[in-house]
Amino acid sequence: MPRRREVPKREILPDPKFGNVELSKFMNVIMEGGKKAIAERIIYGALEQIEKKNPGKDPVEAFTMAINNVKPMVEVKSRRVGGSNYQVPVEVRPVRRLALSMRWIKEAARKRGEKSMALRLANELMEATEGRGGAMKKRDEVHRMAEANKAFSHFRF
């Protein structure tokens, strides 16, 4: 961590096809080993699949809705107090909320059984818009953990 000043967040340029910044961030999450062209192909392929399944509905809107549904509101952090560890529920910052939701959607899509990653991602995004799927399960699990440890919320950071 720098001592002198706060390091500014880098500005991410919107994606070339839809002009959406969130989509561009998600592209960077999907990308592995600097292969952005492959990540681009996967995401645009998934959005095409969504458009095919729901004609007339904007695929970018469906993507944004899926991301917003998966965003966690609270999470637990370990805090050591008097020789024992407590799982303390804390509110998630907006930037981390977005990052976690994108990461969880990617991981849930990877675990699916469909043939191509584009198809897996499309199905995971569709399920997330409907409030189900692997990423939603992960979010609910995190929320349950926070709810179960609500008694320790007075150990705030």
Swiss-Prot record:
CC per GO annotation:
small ribosomal subunit
In the record, what terms sit under GO molecular function?
rRNA binding; structural constituent of ribosome; tRNA binding
Summary of the function given for this chain in its UniProt record: One of the primary rRNA binding proteins, it binds directly to 16S rRNA where it nucleates assembly of the head domain of the 30S subunit. Is located at the subunit interface close to the decoding center, probably blocks exit of the E-site tRNA.
Q: Which family does it belong to?
A: Belongs to the universal ribosomal protein uS7 family.
Q: Which HAMAP family match?
A: Ribosomal_uS7_B
Q: How does it assemble?
A: Part of the 30S ribosomal subunit. Contacts proteins S9 and S11.
| Name listed for the protein in its UniProt record | Small ribosomal subunit protein uS7
| Organism of provenance | Albidiferax ferrireducens (strain ATCC BAA-621 / DSM 15236 / T118) (Rhodoferax ferrireducens)
**Gene responsible for this protein:** rpsG
